[in-house]
């Protein structure tokens, strides 16, 4: 009949947390409703949420430090608080793979460290694919790295050598000081990449 029907088991394969979720912050939706919207792909647009689904949303919000904001308007939250809520939204349907696009871009450094700790815990039960330009920071938290700059460079480890960095066509130096990695970029020479 030309219709592609996915089994229910494939509908929740992915969860997605964007770099910045753009929305009208005056839109009258509360934190719980945002988290529950992560179930829309399996429920459809016009079905109401069950008590068990609401409880799962509240449990996730409690787990990630947002329990006190369950009924707060989403537009009243800080950047870090919104990322927690959108993370709950991304995982409420129990995906097998979580895709993150620059998830710490708009958060402060205190929350950034906490966020990576949350991801480490989540990574015990699901796979995580993260896009980041902050190679120096994520090296401490990831198992493998795939770098893309004109071509794909896959590293089956979180360790990258100076020789490997040269192949990225962009001068990068990594310095690690204890558990706090740093990234220093040299200035590009004119006419060179």
Enumerate the predicted regions with their spans.
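Catalytic Walker B motif of ABC-type/P-loop ATPase nucleotide-binding domains
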Residues: 98-102, 107
């Amino acid at each position: 009949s030309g219709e592609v029907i996915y089994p229910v088991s494939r509908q929740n394969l992915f969860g997605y947390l964007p770099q910045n979720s753009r929305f009208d912050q005056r839109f009258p939706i509360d934190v719980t409703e945002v988290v529950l919207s992560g179930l829309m792909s399996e429920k459809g647009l016009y079905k109401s949420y069950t008590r068990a689904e609401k409880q799962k949303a509240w449990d996730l919000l409690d787990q990630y430090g947002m329990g006190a904001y369950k009924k707060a308007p989403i537009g009243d939250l800080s950047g870090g608080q919104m990322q927690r809520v959108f993370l709950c939204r991304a995982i409420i349907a129990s995906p097998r793979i979580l895709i993150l696009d620059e998830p710490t871009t708009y958060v402060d450094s205190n929350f950034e460290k906490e966020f990576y700790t949350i991801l480490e815990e989540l990574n015990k039960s699901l796979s995580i694919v993260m896009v980041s330009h902050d190679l120096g920071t994520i090296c401490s938290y990831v198992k493998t790295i795939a770098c893309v700059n004109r071509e794909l460079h896959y590293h089956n480890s979180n360790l990258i050598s100076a020789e490997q960095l040269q192949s990225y066509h962009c001068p990068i130096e990594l310095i690690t000081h204890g558990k706090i990695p740093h990234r220093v970029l040299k200035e590009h020479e004119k006419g060179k990449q």
